[in-house]
Amino acid sequence: MTNTERVLAYIDAWNRMDWAAVEEALADDVIYHNIPMQKIEGKAAAMGFITGMQPEGVDWQVIAIAENSDGVVLTERVDNFDMPGGKKLSLPVMGTFEFTDGRISAWRDYFDLATFTNQMA
């Protein structure tokens, strides 16, 4: 399986809200960084953040995906969430995924924080 295929499977797990599969894809020492926010280190902390969002629906749409010769995968996405209380969040994102032994060891998502906070208000 290529790292591109791993990322697509990871996104599919998010879309199914299969949190066990999301967790399985992460390295124990993963670094997860939503660039406008604080960096999160470790699988337990990453999963705490992820499940703490409590979405009622997830639909990440991949616009473009590419893998370089080092196996780093870059995604251009629109991450859509149905949030509690009927709120809808649609966030354009550029994401970078790095791998160690087939698991995501670094994940950085770049997005506009104002777009996020305005939709969550």
State where each predicted segment sits:
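C-terminal and inter-domain tail/linker signature
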Residues: 1-121
